């Protein structure tokens, strides 16, 4: 029989840098999860993506065990990395802070495809382009 799910926790944690301090510790602690066990498992799974922010969905079961699924980094983080900028524009319609090429947008869309609610790559590209525009990035 399947285990009874008692909680779903969604967090965004830097890859390979999960530790028991906030926000990880309190979020897991209130569900009774072994925090160090999660941190070790998460860090081992995300070592290759060092420096990226990784969304993770943790399923907590009634016996205090857990499982987790890592997702692809947020589109905004991938776009900032592609454009080599520290943050997006505070006034995206007026100030353009960087440029990304169509090829870079397509590459990001292909990477994000499993997590996007788009049926084909063209729809995914349009989604990523919209994110880029709202960050003040120019698509060339």
Swiss-Prot record:
InterPro entries, per the entry: Ribosomal_uL11, Ribosomal_uL11_bac-typ, Ribosomal_uL11_C, Ribosomal_uL11_C_sf, Ribosomal_uL11_N, Ribosomal_uL11_N_sf
GO molecular function terms listed in the Swiss-Prot or TrEMBL record: large ribosomal subunit rRNA binding; structural constituent of ribosome
Gene Ontology biological process terms in this record: translation
Cellular component GO terms, alphabetical: cytosolic large ribosomal subunit
Superkingdom, natural source: Bacteria
Keywords: Methylation, Ribonucleoprotein, Ribosomal protein, RNA-binding, rRNA-binding
Mod. after translation: One or more lysine residues are methylated.
A UniProt-annotated Pfam family: Ribosomal_L11_N
Subunit structure: Part of the ribosomal stalk of the 50S ribosomal subunit. Interacts with L10 and the large rRNA to form the base of the stalk. L10 forms an elongated spine to which L12 dimers bind in a sequential fashion forming a multimeric L10(L12)X complex.
Function description: Forms part of the ribosomal stalk which helps the ribosome interact with GTP-bound translation factors.
Similarity field: Belongs to the universal ribosomal protein uL11 family.
NCBIfam families, A to Z: L11_bact
Protein name: Large ribosomal subunit protein uL11
């Amino acid at each position: 029989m399947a285990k009874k799910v008692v909680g779903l926790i969604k967090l965004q944690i830097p890859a390979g840098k999960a530790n028991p301090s906030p926000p990880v510790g309190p979020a897991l602690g209130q569900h009774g999860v072994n925090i160090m066990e999660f941190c070790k498992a998460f860090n081992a799974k995300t070592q290759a993506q060092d420096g990226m922010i990784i969304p993770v969905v943790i399923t907590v079961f009634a016996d205090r065990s857990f499982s987790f699924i890592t997702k692809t980094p947020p589109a905004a983080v991938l776009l900032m990395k592609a454009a080599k900028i520290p943050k997006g524009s505070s006034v995206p319609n007026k100030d353009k802070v960087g440029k990304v090429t169509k090829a870079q947008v397509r590459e990001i869309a292909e990477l994000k495809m499993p997590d996007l609610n788009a049926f084909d790559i063209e729809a995914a590209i349009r989604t990523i382009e919209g994110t880029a525009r709202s960050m003040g990035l120019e698509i060339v």
